[in-house]
Amino acid sequence: MLLLVQLVFGFAVVLAPGALVARALGVRRASATLAWSLVVVFGALAATFLLSASLDLTLVLVLAAGVAAAPAAVRRTRLDRRDRRPAEERKLQLVTCAFARGRRAVSAAGAVLGLLLWHVAGNVGGDGFFHLARVQKLLAFGDLSVGSMNEFPDGGLHPGYAFPLWHGFLALVAKVSGADPVDVVLHGPTVLAPLAAVLGYEAGWALFRRVVPAVTAAAASVALVAMAPSHGGAFTALALPATAARQLLLPAALALAIEATRRPTPALLASTGAASLALAVVHPTYALFLWIPFVGFLLVRLLWRRPDVRPGLLALAALVAPAAAFFAWLLPVVGDTASVAPDAAERTRAFEQYAGQLAGDADRFSVVPELFGRTGAVAVAALLLLPLAGLAARRRWAAYVVGGALAVLVVCLVPWIFTPFSDAVSLSQSRRLAGFLPLAFALAGGIGVLARLIGRLVVPVALAAGIAFQLLYPGDFGYMLRDGGPAWATWVAVAGAVVALVVGFRARPPLERPAALASALLLAPTYVHGLAHWTPSGARRPNPLSPGLIEAVRGEVPAGAVVYADPEASYRLGAFSPVRICVAPPGHVADTVDNHPRARVEEFRRFARTGDLAVPRACGATWLVVDRDRFPQLAFPLRVVHRDERWVLYRLGG
């Protein structure tokens, strides 16, 4: 319980300055709070790097920003109350009360989800070690720069995380709360889950302006990401940058951008730009992936109704301009990456790595249609409901569903578009665009249209469809795509979206009605499945490093020292202590000119064969860790700092 209180306090303190900035601008949304909080941290970190200072300066600057914004926030609250006319006050109260009721319900449900996530946190795994290592270095080093977080002493920046904004955010939470960074990464999702739910609701509210479909959209997002995969799904990784970008920052940016198409005020446009910048810094390609459906939305909105053209273009500019400025700074780093603008050998290697998700050959390819429905029953239902958006063409949600879906589907399914797109952003990233299909909104809006068409029959139909789809298409969540979703559902969505685009030209009132019960019953089987398998994932295995070894490295090895070990041990050592390493699994580090991860692995294999200490010394290592279970032949006449049944820590010296 104490740890939970610490984490809540830490996140609240770091988010508070952003909340005050957003309030000073008059934007009362969690989306704006998150966006401005990260922009404040971004500015504070940038100043810290320029001055080669420590995270103490970052924290002081973040808190100073909050103090500076507080008077303006109080003044803005008073002005808003004074300047409203009675008629506007009544109308605003009706809208605000409806929005607030839905947000309270979603926030409460998100809090319950967060507490449930505490029990399935399990162990750090996968990319978690990579990100945790960066947080450790930010907390430990006193002369920070953008290169301080590099895992290798002679390595370079990671193109996806060149500026460690989210890592800095987590490091500040750890510093303020006093919690161990490992606990922040493992249990941070408990605190972030309510925020994710509210942000999903705000994005739904911006599109629908009604409580029921907005709540349904938020619930569908949770079903797709947390319930369908079992074991908490990706929500257990909500403290990691990729998941945070997808489940927190992207809905925040979308909510603000859609609001800006309604009211393109300077405050909303600035907040949209702040969210876009934060998204671009935390996970660059996801900012680009947001532009694609948003442009599709604007084009369809233009074809169906013209009044939104100028506000829509302003909102798009707010999304693009700040992110593009960051991309200009990032471009030299991206240019050193093997997977961007790849040669023939690299493209063939990547194609073979993701072969199950691709159709075609290494020279021209697209994603397979099964990829769009791989997240299970809710995804399949959303694909089938998507065409019904054409019957509500006057609504913003319908334009976003049809336009966003067509934009994503065309890029992903047309080889002569998808191949150069993959060359530009890397195949590792481009295949993820399929996950940006607006499925949650398609389901939330489509079920309302279906309710208008078939009346009360929608309730048993929704329940039967939810059960049938969960049994037939439970989802395919492995790293390799084996079965995926039904291809026919994707083609129904493609054809239906085209038909919906044509149908939308007819000027007719939208066909839709509230469908709360039907929405709940459609999602219920997936929630039952998820909760029935609510256990820690076996994929995140216990840390093989012994507690004694970790304690010895933390106590004896200075921060920033270079430790040599096998790739798997090295990767984990950096996560538990602020040390540099010489080798890591190639799949978990950037394949850049400076990093050359595969060559490093080959060097370690030579060391394992020969025991030549010149190999670790060439990397600058002054400490050596040996896994005696895997490499019993490696024993050296060096000073032993720690020894247990499996691990030995040697002092290698200069």
Positions of PLM-derived features:
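Membrane-embedded, hydrophobic transmembrane alpha-helices
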Residues: 1-89, 94, 448-450, 454, ...
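Membrane-helix boundary/interfacial segments in multi-pass membrane proteins
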Residues: 5, 54-59, 178, 229-245, ...
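Extracytoplasmic
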Residues: 9-12, 482-491, 506-654
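Membrane-interface helix-loop junctions at the exits of transmembrane helices
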Residues: 42, 116-120, 141, 215-233, ...
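Perimembrane helix-loop-helix junctions
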Residues: 90, 290-320
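Active-site lumenal/periplasmic loops and adjacent helix-entry segments of GT-C-fold
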Residues: 102-248, 260, 531-542
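Short hydrophobic alpha-helices at membrane interfaces in multi-pass membrane enzymes
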Residues: 259-277, 456-461
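Hydrophobic, aromatic-rich transmembrane alpha-helices
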Residues: 376-401, 448-451, 497-506
